[in-house]
Amino acid sequence: MNPKMILTGVSKKYTLYRNNTEKLKAMFFPKTREQHRDFYALKDINLEVYEGETIGVIGINGSGKSTISNILASVIPPTEGEMTVNGETSLIAINVGLNKNLNGYENIEQKCLMHGFSKKEIEELMPAIEEFADIGDFIDQPVKSYSSGMKSRLGFAISAHTNPDILIVDEALSVGDKTFYQKCKDKIDEFKAQNKTIVFISHNIKEIKNLSDRVLWLHNGEVREFGDKNEVIKQYEDYINWFNKLSKEEKEAHKQELKEMRSLAPSLYEEQENGKAGSGGDGTQPIVQPKRDKQAVKSAVWFFSQLVVFAVIFLTAAYFLVVPQLTDGSGSEELEQVAVGAEVQAGTSMGDIDNSDVSL
């Protein structure tokens, strides 16, 4: 089978800021980023999806499912690693790809134009898309007035009729009714019969079992398991059952541990996995806190040095802008008067010199 999507060492990293002021400061002063922690939404993902496959993606909230769907659809780029996609992708997700200020017809036209359709082709597709979405008179209304189900209907209808090579469905069926769900399932089965590749992301295990050939379990931003759907789903359900049996305090501690692990640098993460991180060598203290005092001093010195440079540039620019204005208008008249006065005085002095010469 031919691979349609290949991910090699793909990671997505975000820098966490406490507020918008710190984020803005980091944009203009990159060195201040050293004070903030990096968070891995995805880490070292290696994955191959073949032509005609339907891959189900499962995982608890925050495991990286939506991030990987956005990367596969080229909505966002990976921070690290390489990705190869052989074919045109179409992402179906709530609130993704729809302009909230445009109505249904305008969104259909916009998305079809982005997929390379001509005006004539769009006119021919419009009735089929409108019928599939089945949102009634709301097709004439701005998308911002739609419910989540309506957005999902319209998004799926557009993507299904643009005939993509790879269809990525991210929780888009979770907000629809049973009638619409069956309609979407029939369309997905039609795509499978056409040997198209589908990535299906859902919390609904029953949907994953019914639609998928293989299942990817993402956990804490990493691939926990990938393979036979029955085996992977069983392991996932065992984990969920184990987690649900924990006390409230144990659940919070487990969540905090996972959160801290995703914030580690790669080398520290490897040490954590090998049980070398922490003061006791048992991985109990995975986070190495940066020396914020020294970093703060360095950042402050660097910030004020940049401020001085900016002040010098500003004053220099102001000098060259203000001085020429002094020679215009009233300023030039004053200079002319000064010049005339100087000439008169010089003439008087010369007359005195001439008179003295005569007297001599």
Swiss-Prot record:
Any GO MF annotation of the entry: ABC-type teichoic acid transporter activity
Catalytic activity field: ATP + H2O + teichoic acidSide 1 = ADP + phosphate + teichoic acidSide 2
Disulfide bonds listed in the record: none
Location (main, coarse): membrane
CDD domains: ABC_KpsT_Wzt
UniProt entry keywords in alphabetical sequence: ATP-binding, Cell membrane, Membrane, Nucleotide-binding, Translocase, Transport
Sequence segments annotated as region (Disordered): 270-290
InterPro entries: AAA+_ATPase, ABC_transporter-like_ATP-bd, ABC_transporter-like_CS, ABC_transpr_TagH-like, Bact_Polysacc_Export_ATP-bd, P-loop_NTPase
Region (Unknown): 246-360
Location within or outside the cell: Cell membrane
UniProt GO cellular component terms: plasma membrane
Family of this protein: Belongs to the ABC transporter superfamily. Teichoic acids exporter (TC 3.A.1.104.1) family.
Subunit note: The complex is composed of two ATP-binding proteins (TagH) and two transmembrane proteins (TagG).
Name assigned to this protein: Teichoic acids export ATP-binding protein TagH
Upper classification of the organism: Bacteria, Bacillati, Bacillota, Bacilli, Bacillales
Gene encoding the protein: tagH
